């Protein structure tokens, strides 16, 4: 067995022993927060920035051994991972009540789930990925982010900035397929917010997300509007599964950042319980969409 298949024994767990991400990372974070209008939010505070740094250090190191991301340059990690994740913060800040629960489907490198865990008043964040190596990374990165938040909460001088809601967030890596998590692990209609980024077609994403979302909860999918109206076609193609799985009318929210051209957030409310037949097995889903 190759060395790369043993990340638990050989890959680092402490981000503060690793090389800093550097000025390009910090500058891209600052620029992105400015574009998103978040400089006066918790996302721009020292605590949140420490979580971005800790997470990115581990991502860069682990990506040398396992396929987490092809994006390694610090400024691009900041822009294409951290800032892209935070692009939903203005929207989710209105939806995430104190103590809300969030699930990130296909979390992979921990984006967008971990930046949102550090900036929203959540009680639980689940990072779901069926690939074992990625789930082990998510566990390591989740622990690192949680440690930063816990340390901040114990420091009386920083507790006001961090907020008690951040201090008690439970971050869990879940090494399962979404289909298995829904019923075998008791997660059907368990989450206030279910998110996904770069997972698959919109129809696929919604069939996996809606069964995990509680009634009156919200699904958010990160998408891009390509030339030729690809997103409009995806929305039309997802109509039947939205109706069948209990979703409401989707809306498309443009991301107001010049550094993220064409980025969109597809948002819809869960209006009715999802029938037990959903999500269908992967083979059935693919066959029906041909």
Residue ranges and their predicted role:
Residues 109-122:
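Conserved SAM-binding loop of SAM-dependent methyltransferases across substrates and taxa
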Residues 26, 52, 56, 82, ...:
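A general structural signal for well-ordered alpha-helical segments in protein cores
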Residues 2-98, 133-136, 140-144, 148, ...:
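Class I SAM-dependent transferase core
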Residues 1-2, 172:
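Amphipathic alpha-helical "coupling" segments that flank catalytic cores
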